[in-house]
């Protein structure tokens, strides 16, 4: 039973759109080079992936003598998330937070398994209204996020556990490759 899941996941991982993964990597790299902040958000398992990506960008990419990667997750301040969710609407929990930290040159990375999470779409629209760039990670064919994001990575699956595994693998690959690039400076 367990091997069946791993075999299916391996087949799905082999179908990852590598050109899209490279585009995401390049967007994060350019953000690092201009000393911007990578701001990440998502819901549920995608919120955990957002926090994990920020952790890896903040720790795995540390190279002695080099500037640190700037990264923040809109999912990590739960009092603020719940205050905005309670006082306005859950679809506004990210769009109400981002003006506190967003600066020109920052990059928003949104993670939504379905690509249709209203709060992820709202914050993406806000960043674009400020002239900013949005990376969207999704699955299930991409949903609305795939066409909204400037750079879209759609996991080739419609099974949420696989979509989340692919997003996490992408995040690990990003951190490893960014650390290699920083070491090469």
What are these regions (language model features)?
Residues 1-16:
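Generic N-terminal amphipathic, Lys/Arg-enriched alpha-helix
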Residues 2, 21-24, 50:
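Hydrophobic packing residues in well-ordered alpha-helices of helical domains and bundles
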Residues 12, 34-35, 104, 148:
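Structured helix-beta-strand junction loops
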Residues 16-34:
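A short, well-structured juxtamembrane/interface segment
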Residues 34-44, 108-110:
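Short glycine-rich or small-residue beta-strand-to-loop segments that form or flank ligand, phosphate
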Residues 46, 51-184:
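Glycine-rich phosphate-binding loops that contact phosphosugars or nucleotide phosphates
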């Amino acid at each position: 039973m367990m091997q069946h899941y791993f075999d299916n996941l391996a087949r799905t991982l082999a179908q990852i759109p590598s050109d899209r993964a490279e585009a995401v990597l390049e967007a994060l790299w350019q953000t690092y080079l201009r000393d911007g902040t990578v701001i990440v958000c998502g819901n549920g398992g995608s919120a955990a992936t957002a926090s994990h990506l920020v952790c890896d960008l903040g720790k795995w990419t540390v190279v002695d003598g080099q500037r640190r990667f700037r990264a923040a997750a809109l999912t990590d301040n739960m009092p603020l998330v719940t205050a905005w969710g309670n006082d306005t609407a859950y679809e506004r929990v990210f769009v109400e937070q981002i003006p506190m930290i967003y600066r020109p040159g920052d990059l928003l990375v949104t993670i939504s398994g379905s690509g249709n999470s209203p709060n992820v779409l709202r914050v993406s629209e806000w960043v674009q209204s400020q002239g900013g760039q949005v990376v969207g990670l999704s699955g299930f064919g991409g949903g609305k996020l795939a066409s909204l994001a400037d750079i879209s990575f759609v996991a080739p699956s419609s099974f949420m556990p696989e979509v989340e595994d692919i997003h996490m693998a992408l995040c690990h690959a990003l951190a490893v490759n960014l650390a290699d690039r920083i070491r090469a400076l």
